[in-house]
Curated annotation (Swiss-Prot):
It is found in: Recycling endosome membrane; Cleavage furrow; Midbody; Cytoplasmic vesicle. This is Rab11 family-interacting protein 4B. Keywords: Cell cycle, Cell division, Coiled coil, Cytoplasmic vesicle, Endosome, Membrane, Transport. Residues 228-482 form a coiled coil. It comes from Danio rerio (Zebrafish). The keyword Ion transport does not apply. Residues 71-80 have a biased composition (Polar residues).
Amino acid sequence: MSIQECPESPMLEGEEGRGVERDSDRDSAVDSASEISDGGRTGEKEEGIGICLPREKGDLMHNHFEISDQSALSSASLNEEQFEDYGEGEDGDCTTSSPCPDDEIRINGCSDLGSSVSSSAGQTPRKIHNVDDQMEVFCSQCCKRVSLLSDLENRLKNLKTSSPNRKISSTAFGRKLLHNSNISSSNGSTEDLFHDSTDSSDLDITEKVSYLDKKVTELENEILMSGDVKTKLKQENIQLVHRIHELEEQLKDQETRAEKIMEDELRRHRDAYIRLEKDKNTQIELLRNRLHQLEDENGKMAMNMNRLKSQTEKLDEEKQRMTDKLEDTSLRLKDEMDLYKKMMDKLRQNRQEFQRERDTMQELIEDLRRELEHLQLYKLEAERAGRGRRSSISLSEYSSRTRESELEQEVRRLKQDNQKLREQNEDLNGQLLSLSLHEAKNLFATQTKAQSLAMEIDHASRDQLLEALKQQEEINLRLRQYMDKIILSILDHNPSILEIKN
């Protein structure tokens, strides 16, 4: 940038005032836009506006040399429309194809300062030297700050893709421009304005540089944080999507499994119901058959009851005959029992005597055996002694023979006694048979509970009759078995008891 680049042409003082006024309006509008906007887009627009500040002044002043006040107003309105488009557009940056004032500002460089100095040189030549010195200092500082701002602009352009888009209201921006233009129109002369603009531009540039630096760092941090958050959210979203898909698959599997289970349960319950129906029908059929069978049995039982009544009457008659016989046999049994007791006492005495005799005979036999052994030894000794002792041997033989004869007689007598005891034992067995008959009589006596079974049958129920009939049959069976045993034992031991005597 240099002052020589700017065209020098005479400019009226009023036009100068209007140009500076419009420049101040533009600056105030930019400041208001920087205060309203925030985030990445606000930083970008502040950077672009801050870079365009020194150049917009030259462009506007150069335009004021060629147009009138009316054209100046129309250009201001056009600029306002451009700012409105900037506030409402989708992208906050001015591209090379758009008619943005920043393109003209970047081409013209610092022509605003040169035009302001040349315009003031025609009227106030006394101040040109001081102004040139100030401009050199100002241009060197501007170059440094502009380079710094260009770096910041490049950084913001790099961050522009990830920064959020913020829109500025066109009405608010125009209202702020109008307010700042009215305030700037009331400023002093061109010289005071120039000094104020240089001082304010230095302060504004430093403040904006620091502010933009802070904004850039904040935006970088925010972008990094937002990038991390986005990656985390993307990962979480992917995980949640996978989880949703898994849960949906599980839900489908559960639904299919539940449907299968439901079908299996329905089929199982249907089969169970059919099976229960079949079982019920079979049970009903069995119960019907059982009912018919019981009815038939009931008819048969009624017929059997009549037959059993006749049989019981016959059995009563037979029982009466048997009781008479038992009474006779009981009397005989009583006599036999008395005889049996006597015989048992006699048998006990005979057994005792037989035991005593047996003991004495055993002792006698032992004595004889000892004597016989003694005689045999004596005989052997006598044979050894010689013939001279034959007379003594004959005497001993005679005595031994006499002793043997006595023993033989005793044996015969004992055999006779044994035979007698056997006969007595047989008699006692007969008496035992008579006692068994007496026991049979007692059995009959205990089992006869009533005088007439027919009367009981008339007054008893069916169950009682059946029970009594069973008991009577058991008693008769036991009596028959007992009588058979008695007869067999009599036939084996003493059949003379069964003989019929006239």
